[in-house]
Amino acid sequence: MIELPVVPSASDRKSKPDWLRVKLPIGKEYTKLRALVDEHKLHTICQSGNCPNMGECWGAGTATFMILGNVCTRSCSFCAVATGRPTEYDIDEPKRVAEAVRLMNVKHCVITSVNRDELKDKGAEVWYQTVVRVKEESPQTTIETLIPDVKSDWASLERMISGGQEVVSHNMETVERLYRRVRPQAKYSRSLEEIQRIKAFGKRTKSGIMLGLGETKDEVLKAMDDLVAHGLDVLTLGQYLQPTKMHLEVAEFIHPDQFAEYKEIGLSKGLNYVESGPLVRSSYHAEKHI
C-alpha cells in the first residue's frame, strides 16, 4: 500500500545508473514546507519513504501526507516505513492536516497511511474525517487518497472513500508471482477486488507497480490486463530501489526506454493515464491524474 521506497543501499549506490541520480532537496519552498510539516507534527511519505522526488515536489509546494502514525502493522519486504506495534492514533490529526493544507495553499493534496490492521475499522473513520476537514478548510483543493489493503472489510472501505476525494488509489506494488515474497500479508486477488470495489463506488481509480524485482515483461502486461479488467483508470510504474540491506535487492534496473514502452502499451490496453519512468512514485504528478 505504501508508496515505493527509494533510498538505495551502499552497494546499490555504486551501481546505480545515471538516470536514477537526483539532486538533493533544496530551495525556499522546500524549506518552508519542511518547517510547516515539523510545526504541525505531521508525517509525510515523502520523508518516511525517502522519495527521490521530494525536492521537486516540495519545491513546488506540494506533499503527500501520511496519517494514522508512521509505524505500519505490515512488514512488506520492499518498504522503508517502520514496522511494528503502532501507538494510539492522534484524534486531532484530521484537523492538523487540514490546517497545514490551507497554510500551504495546496491545490492538489495526496493523503496516504500506514496499515492499521489492529483497528476494527482499519482507520476508516480517521480517513473520512481527514478528507472532510481538508475539503472544509480548502474547498478548492482536489484530493487523492492512497489507501491500504482493508482485508475485504468493504464497509470500512466505503467509509474510507466517502469523504469527497476525487481519486482513490490502492497500489498493487508488484506482479502476481512475486506477491508472497514482496507483500507477504497481502493477496493479489484481494487488491484487485479492492480496486474493483472502489470503482463501483464511482471513484477515479489508480494503482502503482514497482519494477526491477525480477518480474518479466509478460507478467507486467498481465498485471495491466488484470487492472483494466477490474476498472483501473490510472497506473504508475517506477523503479524499485533497495531501502536498506535488510530489504529485497534490486534484480534489475529498468531502462527508461522500457518504461516508455510500458506507457504506450498501458494506454493501448485501455488505461486512461499512465505515469511511467524510473523515478516515478505514486504521488508524482498526481495533480495530472484527476
Curated annotation (Swiss-Prot):
The record's remark on the cofactor is:
Binds 2 [4Fe-4S] clusters per subunit. One cluster is coordinated with 3 cysteines and an exchangeable S-adenosyl-L-methionine.
The Swiss-Prot or TrEMBL record lists the needed cofactor(s) as:
[4Fe-4S] cluster
GO MF, one term, reads: lipoate synthase activity
Q: What Gene3D superfamilies does the entry give?
A: Aldolase class I
- Residues annotated as binding [4Fe-4S] cluster 2 are C72, C76, C79
| Primary location | cytoplasm
Enumerate the subcellular locations listed in this protein's record, separating them with semicolons: Cytoplasm
Tell me which EC number(s) this protein carries: 2.8.1.8
Give the UniProt entry's GO cellular component terms.
Answer: cytoplasm
Pathway per the UniProt entry: Protein modification; protein lipoylation via endogenous pathway; protein N(6)-(lipoyl)lysine from octanoyl-[acyl-carrier-protein]: step 2/2
Ranges of residues in domain Radical SAM core: 58-272
The family database entries (SMART domains) matched by this protein are listed as: Elp3
PROSITE patterns with a match to the protein in the record: RADICAL_SAM (PS51918)
Output the InterPro entries linked to this UniProt entry: Aldolase_TIM, Elp3/MiaA/NifB-like_rSAM, LIAS_N, Lipoyl_synth, rSAM
Question: What keywords appear on the UniProt entry?
Answer: 4Fe-4S, Cytoplasm, Iron, Iron-sulfur, Metal-binding, S-adenosyl-L-methionine, Transferase
Q: Which reaction does it catalyse?
A: [[Fe-S] cluster scaffold protein carrying a second [4Fe-4S](2+) cluster] + N(6)-octanoyl-L-lysyl-[protein] + 2 oxidized [2Fe-2S]-[ferredoxin] + 2 S-adenosyl-L-methionine + 4 H(+) = [[Fe-S] cluster scaffold protein] + N(6)-[(R)-dihydrolipoyl]-L-lysyl-[protein] + 4 Fe(3+) + 2 hydrogen sulfide + 2 5'-deoxyadenosine + 2 L-methionine + 2 reduced [2Fe-2S]-[ferredoxin]
At which positions is [4Fe-4S] cluster 1 bound? Answer: C46, C51, C57, S283
Matching PANTHER family: LIPOYL SYNTHASE, LIPOYL SYNTHASE, MITOCHONDRIAL
Family per similarity comment: Belongs to the radical SAM superfamily. Lipoyl synthase family.
What name is this protein filed under?
A: Lipoyl synthase
